[in-house]
């Protein structure tokens, strides 16, 4: 977990009726995330805080699910004291930034999640296999956690065979911009009653997309939907994520999968 924050503000009193202020603040955050787990996994490890999202890579802990966000905001405010009973406050603001969460993705290969149900003792039917899986879960962290070195070795083999990477780290991104204008007026009718009204206008644009964050030693990735390949076998059109560029080859830093705007 790594987080910082800042807040800066300055105000200028123009005269008895008018003042303006400028405020900016933000909080860049980077944190490892938790994956959902089953009671079986908790019981095997005697640990209700078990998190299957991490594992050791060259002796160091690495989390596959890391969230980063930074959305700084700037506000310009004008205060107008119309008279002793009436005040008008207007603010124009701008927020921009990005939020992204990484995750493992894989193609035509074994599920890399250590708590995938096929890898659990409860999935086994032979008692000797149940005992073996139970022992491995309780005594070998390369079984109960992500085996990063294994994923790299599988990708190196794919490189040698001239095939696409079997495992990658993707980042699911939302890059946003938001403009805000708000104006509020308050008027005191008497000691016990006041009137308040205002206007609030907002414009939001968010770009939602995926990007390859880490090839995990692989050479390339083909931008197709493997679930569509499975469900519509033989249909080479439905499986394409980008119909304008079928079977597009993508690498680290490239956008793939989906890319659209929300408003």
Please name every model-derived segment.
Residues 1-2, 11-17, 82:
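Outer-membrane beta-barrel pore proteins
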Residues 19-77, 100-174, 234-251:
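Acidic/polar loop-and-plug regions of large Gram-negative outer-membrane beta-barrel proteins
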């Amino acid at each position: 977990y790594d987080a910082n924050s800042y807040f800066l503000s300055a105000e200028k009193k123009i005269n008895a009726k008018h003042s303006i202020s400028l405020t900016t603040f933000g909080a860049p955050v980077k944190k490892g995330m938790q994956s959902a787990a089953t009671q079986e996994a908790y019981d095997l490890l005697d640990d209700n805080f078990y998190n299957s999202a991490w594992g050791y890579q060259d002796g160091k802990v690495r989390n596959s699910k890391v969230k980063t966000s930074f959305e700084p905001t700037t506000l310009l405010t004008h205060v107008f004291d119309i008279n002793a009973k009436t005040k008008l406050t207007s603010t124009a603001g701008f927020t921009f930034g990005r939020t992204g969460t990484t995750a493992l993705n894989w193609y035509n290969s074994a599920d890399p999640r250590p708590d995938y149900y096929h890898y659990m003792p409860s999935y086994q039917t032979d008692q000797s296999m149940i005992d073996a899986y139970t022992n491995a879960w309780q005594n070998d962290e390369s079984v109960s956690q992500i085996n990063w070195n294994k994923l790299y070795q599988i990708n190196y083999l794919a490189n040698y065979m001239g095939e696409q990477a079997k495992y990658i780290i993707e980042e699911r991104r939302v890059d946003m911009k938001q403009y805000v204008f708000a104006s509020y007026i308050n008027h005191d009718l008497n000691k016990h009653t006041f009137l308040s009204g205002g206007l609030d206008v907002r414009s939001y644009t968010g770009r939602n997309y995926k990007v390859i964050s880490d090839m995990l030693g692989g050479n390339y990735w083909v931008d197709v939907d493997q679930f569509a390949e499975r469900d519509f076998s033989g249909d080479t059109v439905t499986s394409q994520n980008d119909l304008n560029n079928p079977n597009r080859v993508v690498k680290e830093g490239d956008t793939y999968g989906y890319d659209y705007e929300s408003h």
